[in-house]
């Protein structure tokens, strides 16, 4: 459950509606405003602020409020990055691009 201090008494379920997505696996992040990105090929929740995968049917999930979600891709890989001011200051975008290549 996610609570908002911007909208009084608001509650949002932390879940994914995957009813129509057969055979889809999910990799999500326990985001901590770090400069860490990981390449993954299995579903799960990873302590990172960037995910990269070559695996088809592995959905990468990023959650944002006032941070910036970034998607990167080429013919073989896809990646997502959660960038807040701290991650930006610690060069997570640059480090994830290096990890991506």
Specify the residue positions occupied by each region the protein language model found.
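Active-site microenvironment for binding and transforming phosphate-containing groups
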Residues: 1-101
């Amino acid at each position: 459950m996610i609570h908002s201090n911007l909208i009084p008494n608001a509650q949002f379920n932390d879940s994914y509606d995957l009813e129509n997505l057969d055979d889809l696996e999910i990799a999500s992040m326990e985001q901590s405003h770090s400069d860490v990105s990981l390449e993954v090929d299995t579903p799960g929740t990873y302590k990172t602020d960037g995910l990269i995968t070559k695996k088809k049917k592995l959905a990468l999930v990023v959650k944002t409020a006032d941070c910036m979600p970034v998607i990167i891709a080429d013919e073989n890989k896809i990646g997502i990055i959660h960038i807040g001011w701290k991650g930006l200051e610690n060069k997570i975008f640059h480090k994830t691009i290096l990890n991506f290549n």
